[in-house]
Amino acid sequence: MKLGLPYKGSKNTIAEEIVSKLPPGHKILDACCGGGAVLMALALSLKYDSVVGNDLNPATIALLDAVLINKGQIEYEHPPVCTRDDFFNSLQRIENGDFDIQDCVNKFCASFGNDGKTYLYGAQIEEYKLAAEQMLTAETLEQRRKFYRKFYSLINADNSEDKERLQKLEFMQRLQSLERLERLERLERLERLERLERLERLERLDIFDIDYKEFDVVYFDIPYKGTNKYDFEFDYDRFYSLFKSLKTDLNINAFLSEYDAPFTCVAEFEKTQLMAAAVGSSKTTSREKLYYNGSADEYRALMGRNFDEKSEQLSLF
């Protein structure tokens, strides 16, 4: 199953591979846990007695908490509809710091491409999609019948003679997938997961303010350098100093996901991401690397019998 929240840049396709390249330990920190894919893989792996997640994004931490720790906060059977206005009102409340769990659900489940910024449905199909959602999830049979009739009338009204058959077919294909409900189903499946008792807590701290002394392994997934995908400036030089000092000053083994970094590369992963489009979708593939704040020999010793001599990591030394 897919791990983590519906999240742009999610590592759900490679999370378990990443965890397999990390050494076992007592307590591990996922310092930039984002949508929680690696965090959940860590908890499920049973390689650690305790797992802690951290991220600066308040909506992310609130939703992870609702799905993984303090469960029962999200309505799955009859989820509230999320119109375009609802979506942007939720974003505003999150920005103001005065939000509830439904605002977090709206942000992550009703955004296009999981970007948390753009409303999921285009203006051309929004009315159809919302009617289709509600004919499946409205609380009463009477309400579901009402939205079924609305959906049916919308489809029939759109069946005018000036529309070509191919255009109509493409339009109907776009209506088949109710992405928001699919993402809610994903959250519900995650909430039902067991074996997450090793997930100790979630925090919301700047990575430069964390007291790392309680951890013997730390994993970072910082903004990738040169990608220009973020609305804030990240101090890479300061981070590199922190990453290095965890080993030299505290003897903490730290790992970093990046495309390129000035540290020991211990593994590579091929990540495929599905990119949403107006009709259909496309795939992009990238090579992500895992870096270590020690030497190659130290990494081999850390992994012990778990070091995979046959894996691609061997050629990186």
Residue ranges and their predicted role:
Residues 45, 49-201, 316:
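Class I S-adenosyl-L-methionine-dependent methyltransferase module
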Residues 12, 35-38, 57-60, 69, ...:
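Short, solvent-exposed loop/turn segments at secondary-structure junctions
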Residues 119-121, 126-130, 226-238:
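Mobile active-site "lid"/loop adjacent to the S-adenosyl-L-methionine
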Residues 203-236:
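Active-site segment flanking the S-adenosylmethionine/decSAM binding pocket
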Residues 1-32, 37-44:
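S-adenosyl-L-methionine
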Residues 26, 51, 217, 253:
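Hydrophobic "anchor" residues on beta-strands that sit immediately upstream
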Residues 225, 231-317:
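Long, positively charged, glycine-interspersed low-complexity recognition regions
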Residues 29, 54, 220:
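Active-site flanking residues adjacent to catalytic metal/cofactor-binding acidic residues
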